[in-house]
Amino acid sequence: MTVFRKFAAKFHVVDHCTKSNMFALLTKRISLPQLICAYRCRSTSSAESCGAFDLVIVGGGIVGCATAREMLIRHPTLKMAIVEKENALAMHQTGHNSGVVHAGIYYKPGSMKAKLCVEGLKLSYEYFCKHDIPHNKVGKLIVAQNKDQIKKLDDLYDRGIKNNVPDLQLVGKDCISKYEAKCQGEKALWSPWTGIVDWAVVCKYFANEFQKMGGKVYLNYEVTGFSEMTESKGKEDLSPILVQSKDKCIPTKYVLTCAGLHSDRLAVMTGCDLSPRIVPFRGEYLLLSDSKRHLCTTNIYPVPDPRFPFLGVHFTPRVNGEIWLGPNAVLAFAREGYRWRDINIRDCIEMAKFPGLYKLCFRYFIPGCKEMIKSIFYPLAVRDLQKFIPEVSFRDVKRGPAGVRAQALDNNGNLVDDFVFDGGKGSIGGRVMHCRNAPSPAATSAMAIAKFIADKLETDFKL
């Protein structure tokens, strides 16, 4: 027994060093993945001393944290953990978006996106008020500039009504200034429930609640693979999956991945198909000067062109008083490529080998080139903004922050616009669920998405 204690102390085999199971472990074969993992875990860290879990969620963005919170509310006795590769939560998509609380206007009636957005809108505002999270219902104007856009605007209104978007209304040319004094257009759609919030703050509130209920959060934990503990096969009381990192590992019964920009890579680790692949698109914002902030008090959006996948540049007030203009949409050369000079060789090679990206680029070649030109010569983007507020000039703007959108793409170059869940192959795959695509507006819908995923976890894993 003394020999085993020395072995356990040296290799930190997580959650298998109790007196009750020392002898049992000594009489069992230890698999190669376990030995590798044990060797990696030879230096003590907080993750190694935590023991085994019922459920580990990979990814500390808003969908992962909201789902973790929802699962512990439903099942307070579950032992759960969130692992995040960065040194803080909400470091990527959650912390680099426009901060808009969407009302659910754009989405196909009856679709999951439409239902979850409208439900998430109401749940979000209730949560903000309950926890005194700074937010503001500034509303949104979707402004038509010509007759062709008016027809599309009317179609959007019908879609919003079918989606049960609250208090949606059409306003004529003379009434636009009632909602935004300096805004011009032929007709507009007014959505008073659209708002603004800092979604990174909301994400951290979810994580704090999760921790208060007994959940654990481990930062700087980059998952490098999943392996199976062979001696636990067929035994429900053990934790057969090892969630591996570079120098540590955590045993768990089940795994949910909500890895955003890296979701496809984690899925492949458990034998899932390569498709859909994640292609990173960078959205770059401009900042309106302090002296011109009075020009914009509400969200101002163009009528979206159905030929193109993104909503177009818009005016967005922020809870800190800033006005963001944009974003554009340009292909990034790294999955975490927030600047032009951010280039990741591995990411570029993967994109170069992916036929779906070539098909997408061919389909949107001209608008894609225009977006890249506007990215380099940003004063050109101001022309689009002047259609709505003519008083804005290129002297009033400067470069602002950027975000990277994890766009799921199939092999035919089609943008995947719905939720994608996957498991994998073999005994490991049966215990792992991958959220491979949680499409925009995932932040607004996060609490509703969490309920949906929790239902699926309960069904698939019989929790």
Regions found by a protein language model. Name each.
Residues E48-V63, A81:
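Beta1/beta-strand and adjacent pyrophosphate-binding region of the FAD-binding site
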Residues L189-Y254, C258, H262-R265, M447-E458:
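Helical element adjacent to the flavin cofactor pocket in flavoenzyme catalytic cores
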Residues D273-S275, S291-R293, R318-A402:
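Flavin-binding catalytic cores
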Residues G99-Y179, G185, G312-V313, E322, ...:
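Dinucleotide-binding Rossmann-like beta1-alpha1 core, especially the glycine-rich loop
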Residues L360-L463:
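C-terminal catalytic lobe of FAD-dependent flavoproteins
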Residues A66, F226-I345:
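Flavin-dependent oxidoreductases
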Residues L72-G95:
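Glycine-rich FAD pyrophosphate-binding loop
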Residues K108-E119, V143-K152, W190-Q211, Y218, ...:
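Short beta-strand to alpha-helix junction loop
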